[in-house]
Amino acid sequence: AFYHYFDGKDALLSSLSVLFDERYEELMQQPHDEMDCIELLCWLNQELFTTIENTVSIELLARLFSSQLVTKGEKHLLDRKRTYYRLLRQIVSQGQEREELTDTRTVSEIVKAYAMFERGLMYDWCLSGGEYSLVQYAREMMPLFLDGFRKK
């Protein structure tokens, strides 16, 4: 019934990426100048995961991952032109310029690792049927993960 608003399931699923990107655009309008890049990435992650936990069904998120695994066409989650990737590149690049992040890894390597870790958190949450809070778990794990990229 929900699908009749979209041109099939693929359009519905790809709209999730658009929803996430729109959320990032809204968040970046809020003041965040006081944060270093790791705090900013953790905050964005918390806000996105709160949106996901409160408004996106696990079944729909699982279908998005499933469809991206089997699709031969466009993989929305990996589209480097998305707001998500542009924003991550900007934050990581500034983090390196401000000497908050290591320069032993390229911007692209750090962005790829971050996106992969974030997807992994969502994927595991789907696999476990949401038996734990995605937001709470990411609040503990994301800073530990990102600390590995902090300039020593």
Predicted regions and their residues:
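Amphipathic alpha-helical segments used for helix-helix packing
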Residues: 52-72
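Hydrophobic/aromatic-rich alpha-helical bundle segments in the mid-to-C-terminal region
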Residues: 96-143
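Phosphate/oxyanion-binding loops and surfaces in catalytic or ligand/nucleic-acid-binding neighborhoods
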Residues: 19, 23, 47, 51-55, ...
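Hydrophobic alpha-helical connector segments
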Residues: 15, 19, 29-56, 107-114
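C-terminal alpha-helix
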Residues: 91, 144-148
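Short hydrophobic/aromatic patch on the recognition helix
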Residues: 1-6
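Short amphipathic alpha-helical segment with a characteristic S/N-K-E followed by hydrophobic residues
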Residues: 8-13
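Amphipathic alpha-helical packing segments from all-alpha helical-bundle domains
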Residues: 25, 72-98, 108-112, 116, ...
